[in-house]
């Protein structure tokens, strides 16, 4: 599903990735391990279009994406949950989830793109679309209404699925995101990413700053998402034990270079991995 081939990426003069190659098969969980500064987050930023590679190529479902904008990449079905969560702390849980659904339910026609450029809210975009279709006659207006109703049903289905994974978010749907606990904020960040109904989920350090019991719960849910939906997941994580426990395959990054690549089972048995990342 996802292939990186000899990807080199940099921040100004500082090269962060040196010829990185990796594959993420459809339906799998692949983890990238490494210390701080190894290039793990940079790898995800390159995939999601936040950092354009200097060299190499990135393909998603056979299509090159390394020259696409982040917005275009999101529209293909790639959702990036960044390190640090980056929630809208002044908005409620439900409002954050609605923003997560933006890319999927905003509409893909020219009128929808115009409405997005104008910065209209979701209800405003729907109204804009209906006005546009009305100019084409009653038949187009009826089609616009049907499309709106279908989008609404799809949105409600996505929201229900997120609340099924994270019941605490349903209980706190009207609570301001900035007042949630760290674990609840991480759940909200993942839920917001799921609202776009992605085919590939990029997870950057989901355990960061969380208590061990909360971390285990987060990883249990990540595994459930993969198993129940068949969702493909690329996971960047410092907690190698938990990451390898749910992953099918893993890569180890050191100073921007892949130094190990194997099945998660073999990596758990690898003495170098045990010494460096598993505390053995």
Model segments located where?
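Glycine-rich phosphate-binding loops of nucleotide-dependent enzymes
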Residues: 1-280
């Amino acid at each position: 599903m996802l292939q990186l081939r000899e990807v080199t990426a940099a921040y100004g003069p500082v090269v962060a990735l040196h010829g990185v190659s990796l594959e993420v098969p459809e339906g799998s969980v692949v983890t990238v391990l490494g210390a701080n500064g190894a290039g793990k987050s940079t790898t995800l930023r390159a995939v999601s279009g936040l950092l354009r590679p200097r060299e190499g190529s990135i393909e998603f479902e056979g299509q090159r994406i390394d020259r696409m904008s982040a917005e275009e990449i999101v529209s293909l079905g790639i959702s990036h949950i960044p390190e640090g969560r980056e929630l809208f702390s002044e908005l409620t849980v439900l409002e954050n989830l609605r923003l997560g659904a933006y890319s999927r339910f905003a509409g893909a026609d020219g009128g929808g793109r115009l409405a997005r450029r104008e910065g209209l809210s979701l209800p405003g975009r729907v109204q804009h679309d209906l006005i546009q279709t009305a100019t084409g006659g009653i038949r187009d207006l009826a089609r616009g209404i049907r499309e709106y109703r279908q989008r609404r049903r799809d949105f409600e289905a996505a929201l229900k699925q997120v609340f099924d994974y994270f019941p605490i978010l349903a209980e706190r749907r009207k609570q301001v995101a900035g007042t949630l606990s760290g674990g609840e904020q991480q759940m909200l960040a993942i839920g917001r990413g799921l609202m776009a109904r992605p085919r590939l989920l990029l997870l950057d350090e989901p355990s960061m700053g969380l208590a061990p019991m909360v971390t285990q719960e987060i990883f249990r849910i990540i595994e459930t998402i993969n198993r129940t939906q068949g969702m493909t997941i690329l996971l960047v994580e410092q907690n190698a034990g938990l990451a390898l426990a749910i992953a099918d395959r893993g890569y180890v990054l050191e100073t921007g270079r892949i130094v190990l690549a194997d099945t998660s089972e073999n990596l758990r048995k690898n003495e170098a991995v045990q010494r460096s990342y598993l505390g053995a």
